[in-house]
């Protein structure tokens, strides 16, 4: 009898091999939700792999698992009623040794439910469920890497994930790192709980499509990252629903070392975001952002509709590496976007020395739900080194759109509606050049408030625009700070002025003069754009005393008077680091030091430039929290 059973088993396995299908129950999986089924499912995966590919079938039932490793040419197919549920015991997971350099390596996670590295032609399909078991377990949010990821695919090619539900993650739900040619279709990601429980992280990937999917997450729903020096590019997201999102619905960053290019998002619905944004486009670690398109998006009950940010956190992604330049943010289009019940204004905020450029917003309608008091026009904070988020700039001096340090900005067919009691203008622009507003219409609830406020602006055209309300003035400018303003065919109410100049407000600073006790400032030298400067054609010796041990960032306030980018060099303790300066106004060059120092230790730096034109005014030191996980 025993011999007959063995023969029957071998016949089943043989038949599966012929068909390229491997049923996990044949390999011993119990599917009772109690027995740890990891090794049985892994045996099926390994068998399919050794047979040069096949489908691992997971029938209905609940399978408790630790870590599964997907391999080349294997499809993991979850049949209807099948659930893979993560074990609550750390010992059931493998502490995977990952090969690819990334900020997320070890720091963010070391345990995974489903993992693959360097695999090709892999798939996770079906109508079943992958359940992280994270709502009841793994509630300690720090350190983050003790909470298992659900799915992490690293350096994989030709990946398909279709139809499955990914529920209750303990950490990130689904992380794609350095993957190429990925197709995600018809999935559902839902999770709750505390801590970083992202939905889908598309990290340093190329050629990724996401379609027909639903998201409801504690943290960001779909976030594109660049946690190493690889560009995240050629991403297309369409026909997705976002509901009850604890972070942002669609986001780039904050990790942005490699940068972002060629991203299209279309035909999406976003609802119920209490604290963050429907769309957040941010790069703060040196990487570029270029050629981005969002179109046909509807939002309801969001904190902020959109937030576009260039910052200079400049955090390294691995030991021995540092950010050596600040790249551009440009060529971003927002088209056919409709928003109701927005709590905060949208904003586009660059740097004084590097403006965000080529932004086009067309066919945009926003209805604000909350009236706020505002900071003065010249008192909006900089926070250039901080963790970026739309909420960092609350109480902005505009209820619908605030822009600072932007050039080549085009608004066309834009409608803005204010909340009851709102006193702010609809739009405020500061340090914006080459601006075109056409067909802009907005409510202005306060009779004495302008529809648009301009300061420090140049080459601005406002055409065929009007306020819905009979306020006193359409456009208000700060005296002697706006050049080249053209008003064309705007529609005015009786007794309404088209343009009025008011007294200019003085700016305390045009960059973040952050607090630090470790600083060196040039006291004698030439005056360049209101700052005392040293010409770096002659090297500058600087000695600084450290106040505590930690990761240090040497921040040099520099400008480049040359017509070409110039290389800034620092030398200390036998170490040389370069930074490329490609801006012409005063701005910070933040260089993370490759060596740590003890408290009270004095460090001698030599600052110089290879070519002509670099000027320096300040040398500050700030401490970085490189252990913080985003």
Specify the residue positions occupied by each region the protein language model found.
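Extended extracellular/luminal ectodomain segments enriched in beta-structured repeat modules
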Residues: 546-554, 600
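Short, surface-exposed beta-strand/strand-loop-strand elements in extracellular ectodomains
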Residues: 564-575
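Positively charged n-region of N-terminal signal peptides that target proteins for export
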Residues: 1-4
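Sec-dependent N-terminal signal peptides
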Residues: 6-8
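Glycan-recognition and processing domains
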Residues: 501-545, 557, 616-630
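Extracellular/periplasmic carbohydrate-active domains that bind, remodel
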Residues: 10, 16-504, 559-563, 580-587
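Short beta-strand-plus-loop segments that form exposed binding edges in beta-rich domains
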Residues: 605-613
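Extracellular carbohydrate recognition and processing domains
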Residues: 574-599
């Amino acid at each position: 009898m025993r011999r007959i059973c063995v023969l029957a088993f071998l016949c089943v396995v043989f038949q599966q091999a012929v068909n390229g299908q491997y049923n996990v129950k044949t390999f011993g999986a119990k599917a009772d939700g109690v027995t740890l089924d990891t090794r049985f499912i892994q045996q099926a995966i390994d068998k399919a792999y050794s047979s040069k590919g096949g489908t691992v079938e997971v029938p209905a039932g609940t399978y408790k698992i630790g870590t599964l490793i997907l391999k080349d040419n294997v499809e993991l197919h979850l049949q209807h009623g099948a659930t893979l549920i993560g074990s609550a015991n750390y010992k059931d997971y493998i502490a995977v040794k990952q090969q690819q350099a990334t900020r997320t390596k070890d720091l963010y996670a070391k345990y995974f439910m489903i993992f693959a590295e360097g695999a090709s032609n892999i798939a996770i399909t079906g109508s079943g469920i992958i359940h992280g078991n994270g709502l009841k377990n793994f509630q300690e949010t720090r350190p983050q890497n003790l909470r298992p990821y659900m799915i992490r695919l690293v350096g994989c090619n030709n990946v398909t994930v279709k139809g499955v539900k990914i529920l209750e993650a303990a950490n990130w739900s689904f992380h794609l790192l350095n993957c190429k040619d990925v197709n995600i279709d018809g999935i559902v990601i839902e999770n709750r709980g505390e801590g970083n429980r992202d939905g889908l992280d598309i990290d340093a990937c190329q050629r990724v499509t996401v379609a027909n999917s639903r998201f409801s997450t504690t943290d960001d729903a779909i976030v594109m990252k660049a946690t190493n020096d690889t560009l995240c590019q050629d991403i297309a997201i369409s026909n997705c629903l976002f509901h009850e999102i604890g972070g942002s619905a669609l986001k780039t960053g904050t990790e942005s070392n490699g940068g972002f290019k060629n991203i299209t998002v279309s035909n999406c619905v976003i609802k119920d975001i209490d604290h963050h944004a429907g769309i957040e486009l941010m790069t703060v670690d040196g990487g570029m952002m270029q050629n981005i398109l969002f179109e046909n998006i509807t939002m309801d009950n969001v904190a902020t509709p959109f937030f576009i940010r260039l910052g200079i956190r400049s955090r390294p992604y691995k030991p021995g590496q540092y950010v050596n330049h600040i790249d551009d943010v440009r060529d971003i289009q927002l088209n056919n976007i409709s928003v109701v019940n927005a709590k905060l204004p949208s904003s586009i905020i660059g740097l004084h020395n590097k403006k965000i450029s080529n932004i086009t917003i067309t066919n945009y309608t926003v209805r604000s739900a909350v009236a706020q008091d505002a900071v003065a026009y010249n008192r909006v904070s900089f926070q250039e080194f901080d963790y970026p988020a739309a909420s960092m700039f609350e109480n902005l001096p505009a209820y619908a759109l605030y822009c600072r340090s932007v050039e080549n900005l085009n608004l066309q067919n834009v409608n803005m509606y204010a909340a009851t009691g709102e006193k702010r203008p609809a739009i405020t622009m500061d340090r914006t050049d080459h601006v075109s507003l056409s067909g802009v219409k907005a409510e202005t609830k306060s009779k004495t408030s302008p529809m648009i406020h301009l300061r420090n602006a140049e080459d601005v055209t406002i055409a065929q625009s009007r306020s819905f309300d009979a306020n006193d003035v359409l456009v208000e400018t700060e005296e002697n700070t706006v050049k080249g303003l053209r008003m064309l065919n705007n529609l005015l109410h009786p007794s309404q002025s088209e343009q009025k100049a008011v007294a200019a407000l003085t700016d305390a600073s045009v960059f973040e003069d952050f607090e630090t006790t470790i600083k060196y400032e040039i006291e004698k030298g030439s005056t360049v754009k209101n700052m005392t400067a040293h010409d770096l054609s002659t090297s500058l010796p600087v000695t600084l005393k450290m106040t505590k041990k930690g990761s240090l960032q040497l921040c040099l306030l520099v400008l480049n008077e040359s017509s070409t980018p110039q290389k800034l060099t620092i030398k200390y303790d036998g170490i040389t680091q370069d930074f490329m300066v490609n801006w012409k106004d005063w701005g910070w060059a933040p260089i993370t030091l490759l060596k740590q120092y003890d408290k009270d230790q004095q460090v001698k730096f030599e600052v110089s430039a290879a070519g002509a034109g670099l000027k320096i005014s300040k040398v500050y030191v700030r401490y970085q929290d490189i252990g913080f996980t985003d």
